[in-house]
């Protein structure tokens, strides 16, 4: 009986080995090797195309208008700016308060486009901190504000804000950092529930980029006492200085005029 059982187990092992051999023979015969090769080429080609498309998308962004910014900054020698961390720049004026604003740029907009706005805030005594984003997308570094308050202990009250996508990501950050004083949204809305926080929302009457339906849909996420300002004649792009933006309305005022109105409104909001 034992001999018979042993013979059965031996036969099962041989059958299993034979089956495995047949499987690999079929897998690696000429035809299947050709199929595997073709499949590998197709997969590699798809990956290459996706990589190229991603590269094109991420490198297609709105660049700061260096000439216009240079002209604006000519008489701003009283404003200093310096790096406090990799990709984080602080703007300071002559008579600074103990309040600061951490700012997230709009989606696919070069951070330098907001130098004029940061300068205008610094002139009003607000410590303005501009955060550069990976591939100019704040969604890739929502926590860019981490550690900034610790590096500037002289600033006692911190607000966070941003333009467009940057504003939405700033709101997400505020949602998990209630120690901040409030938020400033420029042409933006909050998908996070920050109804218990102070909030200022500013957008232009000619804004053709911000989705008004989404703005109203997510309006309940903001406090009931929201301070809302509509800049008459302003558009979406003129919170920065990067030229015209696709789909945007034509502004009736200049970018500097819009940014000056914005800086004044932020100062008033902080002073309340």
Regions inferred by a protein language model and the residue ranges of each:
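Short beta-strand element of the alpha/beta-hydrolase
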Residues: 98-106
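Short beta-strand/loop motif that positions the catalytic acidic residue
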Residues: 201-203
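A conserved short beta-strand
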Residues: 179-188, 198
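Conserved alpha/beta-hydrolase
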Residues: 118-138
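Gly/Ala-rich beta-loop-alpha elbow adjacent to hydrolase catalytic centers
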Residues: 162-166, 170
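Short alpha-helix in the alpha/beta-hydrolase fold that links the catalytic acid
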Residues: 117, 210-220
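Short beta-strand immediately N-terminal to the catalytic nucleophile in serine-hydrolase-like folds
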Residues: 160-162, 186
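N-terminal Sec-pathway targeting helices
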Residues: 21-48
């Amino acid at each position: 009986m034992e001999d018979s059982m042993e013979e059965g187990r031996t036969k099962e092992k041989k059958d299993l080995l034979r089956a495995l051999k047949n499987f690999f023979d079929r897998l690696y015969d000429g035809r299947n090797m050709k199929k595997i090769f073709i499949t590998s080429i197709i997969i590699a080609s798809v990956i290459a195309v996706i990589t190229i498309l991603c590269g094109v998308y991420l490198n297609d962004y709105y660049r700061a208008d260096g000439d216009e910014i240079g002209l604006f900054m000519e008489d701003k020698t009283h404003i200093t700016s310096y790096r406090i961390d990799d990709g984080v720049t602080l703007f300071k004026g002559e008579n600074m308060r103990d309040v600061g604003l951490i700012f997230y740029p709009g989606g696919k907009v070069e951070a330098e486009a907001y130098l004029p706005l940061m300068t205008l805030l610094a002139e009003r005594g607000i410590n303005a901190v501009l955060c550069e984003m990976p591939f100019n997308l704040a969604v890739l570094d929502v926590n860019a504000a981490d550690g900034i308050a610790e590096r500037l202990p002289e600033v006692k009250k911190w607000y966070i804000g941003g333009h467009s996508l940057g504003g939405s990501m700033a709101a997400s950050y505020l949602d998990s950092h209630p120690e901040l004083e409030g938020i400033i949204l420029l042409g933006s809305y909050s998908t996070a529930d920050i109804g218990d926080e102070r909030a200022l929302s500013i957008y232009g009457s000619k804004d053709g980029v911000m989705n008004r339906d989404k703005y109203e849909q997510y309006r309940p996420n903001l406090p009931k006492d929201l301070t809302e300002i509509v800049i008459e004649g302003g558009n979406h792009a003129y919170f920065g200085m990067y030229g015209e933006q696709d789909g945007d309305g034509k502004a009736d005022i200049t970018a500097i005029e819009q940014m000056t109105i914005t800086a004044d409104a932020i100062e008033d909001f902080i002073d309340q």
